[in-house]
Structures are given as C-alpha cells and as structure tokens.
C-alpha cells in the first residue's frame, strides 16, 4: 500500500453558485461553471480525464430537457462497463483500485423536485436506488427551519 489517500469530491451548490471541493491530501475548491459539469476522481471538467470527456460526449448527444430524462440517460452513461482495453469506460475495475459507488442528484427550485439516486458499488453491476424521499425531507425540513428562524428575527 502506498498510504496515499485517493480522496473524495464534494459538490456544494444552491440556485446561484456551486463549487467542488477536492478532498485529497491537499484540498482544493473549484467553482462550477454554468451548464454541464462532470467530475470523476480527478479535477472538475478535466480535459485530460477520458471519463469526463466520454460522459460529456454521451450526455450531449440528445436533448435532455428535464431532470428525469437527464438522470435516466446519466445512469446508463455511468454504467458503461469496461468491454475492451481500447474502448473508453466509465467504470474502473483494476487490481488496486476501482469504482466503488455512483451518485446522481438533481435539484429543482422546490424540495419536492429533488432527485437522489445512489448505487453502492460499480453501476454496471448494481442498480441505482432511489433515495429521493429522504433528500426531499431533509430539504423541506431545512426550508421550514430557515423560514421559522427568519420569522423570529
């Protein structure tokens, strides 16, 4: 083992701005740009990352005019398994590392529009499970608490 921490990426966003925090040995904050942003285990929208480029290509082939349609296509894109060494793949499966999970999130103006899907494990071998009710509950509770706090100030 190299004792090197591979890290994690956190996405923090609201209706006006968003950032990715690369939680590695040297954390870094990167602003989201308007439009499609893709991240794998490297930098946000990394032009050297074949998986980011593949995802951008596959996600822009058709008109994705709703969050539901986008997530339906994205779940298929992220489940693209390695079939040959020369074919790009979204899933990594090596001896020393690999895809451990995948998350799809869509946020709307209202909490009821939120969609949260997660798979523990590589998405080509595991189905995305829907955790939207949990996310909607968290968002609604936060909104209620913020309104209550604003009313008491």
Protein language model features and the residues they cover:
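N-terminal nucleophile
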Residues: 1-153
């Amino acid at each position: 083992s190299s004792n090197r921490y591979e890290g994690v990426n956190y996405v923090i966003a609201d209706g006006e701005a968003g950032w990715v925090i690369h939680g590695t040995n040297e954390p870094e904050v990167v602003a989201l740009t308007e439009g499609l942003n893709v991240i794998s285990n490297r930098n946000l929208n990394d032009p050297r990352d074949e998986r980011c480029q593949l995802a951008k290509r596959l996600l822009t082939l058709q008109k994705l005019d709703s969050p539901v349609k986008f997530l339906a296509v994205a779940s298929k894109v992220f489940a693209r398994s390695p079939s040959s060494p020369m074919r790009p793949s979204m899933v990594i499966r090596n001896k020393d590392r690999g895809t451990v999970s995948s998350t799809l999130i869509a946020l709307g103006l209202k909490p009821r529009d939120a969609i949260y899907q997660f798979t523990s494990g590589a998405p080509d071998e595991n189905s995305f499970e829907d955790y939207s009710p949990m996310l909607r509950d968290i968002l609604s509770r936060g909104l209620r608490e913020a309104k209550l706090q604003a009313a008491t100030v």
